């Protein structure tokens, strides 16, 4: 038997050296797609991660199918097992007769059509790999095309006339994905000192962004489109990633925020002070400011709608719900004037 087995190894020497290349190739492709999907999920791109996970399942299934389909060509030769079983039955034969019997059985059992089957397996394997590759490319292209429709351009031209000003919440829903305003547009918004506008009031108002009270030395930035004002650093940080008012969600476009002023400060005007129609009207531009404060939602309805509150002004004009608190906007407007020249940045009356 010892002389028979070397002969068998010589007969199947070429088959023994052949290894299935689809096993490492499929494993490498599956691992690569899986790694890319995990990286996408970690970076917050869930849509691309889902596409890559689906592609991983397709690649893994195709790899298993190819391994099963090419098992005849790359796997163990069934004729070898059959010959070994028949050789064991003829152990009484001499080595020479065993070798002759082996050659006879090989000529009988191994048909010439095996080469055709091998070629067909290779062709099918190549076509399957091409189909898998094209499928992955199609999924990636479909995702990129969907992303381009959802996020066409980071900076879009917004026309405020297309939407009603009475529905700022609806405007915000249509423009959920924006990249905020440029720093130059933010700097063009007017700035004023809180203490100069509310000099006669005792109880301070609150900032709707940081939820803290205003102090007399705080600088506030005004949004002229809605007349709401916030802390300078609070609203600047907000507008870098959002192009809407944080309180009423009204959209801010380049046309209604740029005034060609740099580092401007607003000079306060009392409610009874009139702006002259001559030279003064050309030098300053009057704006109204709406401020408010937070009230707990646990308070009764009558307490929130008193005719006069602690500071002696009518509250509220409008109420904005913020979790367990409500932001009540004062019914009284504070009038301020914007200097038309950047050099007139000092506060004055």
UniProtKB/Swiss-Prot annotation:
Lineage per the UniProt record: Eukaryota, Viridiplantae, Streptophyta, Embryophyta, Tracheophyta
Keywords assigned by UniProt, alphabetized: Acetylation, Membrane, Metal-binding, Transferase, Transmembrane, Transmembrane helix, Ubl conjugation pathway, Zinc, Zinc-finger
Enzyme class of the recorded protein, top EC level: transferase
GO BP annotations, alphabetical order: protein ubiquitination
UniProt key word Nucleus: no
Alphabetical list of Pfam families matching this protein: HIG_1_N, zf-RING_2
Residue positions, PTM N-acetylserine: 2
UniProt membrane topology term: Multi-pass membrane protein
This protein's pathway: Protein modification; protein ubiquitination
Top-rank taxon, per record: Eukaryota
Stated name of the protein: RING-H2 finger protein ATL48
PROSITE patterns per UniProt: HIG1, ZF_RING_2
Location(s) in or outside the cell: Membrane
CDD domains: RING-H2_EL5-like (cd16461)
Signal sequence region: none
Cellular component annotations (GO), alphabetically ordered: membrane
InterPro entries (UniProt xref): Hypoxia_induced_domain (IPR007667), Znf_RING (IPR001841), Znf_RING/FYVE/PHD (IPR013083)
Domain HIG1: 1-85
MF term (GO), any: zinc ion binding
Domain-level remarks: The RING-type zinc finger domain mediates binding to an E2 ubiquitin-conjugating enzyme.
Record-listed E.C. numbers: 2.3.2.27
């Amino acid at each position: 038997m010892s002389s028979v087995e070397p002969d068998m190894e010589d007969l199947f020497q070429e088959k023994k050296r052949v290894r299935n290349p689809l096993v490492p190739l499929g494993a490498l492709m599956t691992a690569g797609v899986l790694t890319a999907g995990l990286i996408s999920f970690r970076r917050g791109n869930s849509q691309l991660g889902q596409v890559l996970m689906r592609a991983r399942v397709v690649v893994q299934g195709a790899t298993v199918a190819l391994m099963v389909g090419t098992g005849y060509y790359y796997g163990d030769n069934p004729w070898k097992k059959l010959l070994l079983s028949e050789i064991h039955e003829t152990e009484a034969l001499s080595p020479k007769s065993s070798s002759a019997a082996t050659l006879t059985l090989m000529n009988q059992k191994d048909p010439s059509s095996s080469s055709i089957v091998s070629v067909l397996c290779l062709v099918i394997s190549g076509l399957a790999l091409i189909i898998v590759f094209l499928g992955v490319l199609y999924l990636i292209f479909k995702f990129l095309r969907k992303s381009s429709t959802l996020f066409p351009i980071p900076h879009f031209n917004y026309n405020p006339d297309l939407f009603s000003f009475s529905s700022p919440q609806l405007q915000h829903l249509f423009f959920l994905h924006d990249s905020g305003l440029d720093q130059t547009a933010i700097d063009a918004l007017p700035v004023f000192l809180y203490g100069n506008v509310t000099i006669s009031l005792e109880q301070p108002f609150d900032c709707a962004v940081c939820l803290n009270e205003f102090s007399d030395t705080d600088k506030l930035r005004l949004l002229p489109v809605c007349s709401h004002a916030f802390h300078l650093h609070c609203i600047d940080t907000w507008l870098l990633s959002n192009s809407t008012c944080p309180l009423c969600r009204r959209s801010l476009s380049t046309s209604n925020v740029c005034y060609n002023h740099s580092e401007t400060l607003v000079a306060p005007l009392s409610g009874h002070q009139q702006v002259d129609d001559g030279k003064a009207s050309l030098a300053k531009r009057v704006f109204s400011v709406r401020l408010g404060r937070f009230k707990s939602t646990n308070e009764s309805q009558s307490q929130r709608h008193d005719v006069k509150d602690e500071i002696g002004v009518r509250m509220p004009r409008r109420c904005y719900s913020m979790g367990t608190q409500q932001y009540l906007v004062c019914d009284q407007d504070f009038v301020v004037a914007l200097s038309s020249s950047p050099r007139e940045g000092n506060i004055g009356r």
